[in-house]
């Protein structure tokens, strides 16, 4: 039997899809090259934006069309959309949708449902917990779900309440990855700063980082995503002493206006966020700062939008992931009066993206002439690419092997990547 996995959304979904791929292969299934060759499609869905949900529905509808013509493939739908829009999935996919697995279920529960669905009678019981190991870097989720309940966000409904993995389980997985040759570990959580709170750990997040940082074979350590309200000075001070932590901080600000931040239920102010960035830069002189921003939140005035423009100019983010507000389910923000017209949202998005691209280009071009360290992720015909400690993409010239750690001198740059040449 042939399968194809289609993944939408975040790194957490990428991680889960990798686990599920390993499971399918372990029970004798073969990965199809394309959807048309598959007997079934496993969709791992994302509900953060309306566009992501619509993308899933379009794909499920396409599978249904093929199913009506050829009797295959069928769909299995998992992830966040499966939690909040099961009726819509069944309406679009009809009899081609054979199984829906909610995003609130953990990997063990998904394993049991898949076993039952495929009537697998015997296989190695531990196989579903194995991580695909042939990678320069690996994502390792440490906490699932979210308890922050921002007014615009559907993740708590789609993913459930926060649930931390035991630290021993995380360290065991990371050790296996490092022993297999992985060089960079990226710890994941919807709000990773909350790691361990449900386990009764007062400083669980920084203690986890400290434990991972000590592991043999680790070259780089990263984490995402942090909630600014849960980042404290003590954590930053302890981070400064970590040998392998990379100087890249993703801190979603969402808005530069205090009234909008309050409506979003973000639990911090513009002033607090600016102080936090200042404290990060004090301790990590070469840190890159990236962020998420929503424009066109309900009732946002032109002046309030301009507050966000001003914040972006003041902080000079290395990158901003900018989205126009999208109504999600029955979240409080979706039900608010004062919804902004689409044309206004698009214009604000266009303006802010233009500003950010100019800032990113300027910051990247300031790297010209400098030498930086890159771990090679891909190499072919005298060219390779990898990422800097600040998580910037570098495309460079030189004959190297995948997973080599090399020095590269930057000679050009734009808003998308740096260009360099091998120096050794």
Give the label of every model feature segment.
Residues 189-198, 230-232, 253-264, 295-302, ...:
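Flexible glycine/acidic-rich beta-alpha junction loops that bind and position SAM and/or redox cofactors
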Residues 179, 206-207, 214-221, 231-291:
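Radical SAM/AdoMet-radical enzyme domain recognition
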Residues 200-211, 233-247, 300-318, 342-347, ...:
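Short, electropositive alpha-helical surface patch
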Residues 335-424:
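Terminal RNA-binding accessory module
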Residues 1-195, 234, 245, 249, ...:
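Proteins enriched for Cys/Gly/acidic motifs involved in redox and nucleic-acid/cofactor modification
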Residues 150, 170, 187, 223, ...:
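Conserved, mostly hydrophobic/aromatic
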Residues 47-52, 182-211, 215, 227-234, ...:
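Conserved glycine-rich "GG(E/T)P / GGGxP" loop and the immediately following alpha-helix
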Residues 76-77, 222-224:
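Short catalytic-loop micro-motif centered on adjacent basic/acidic residues
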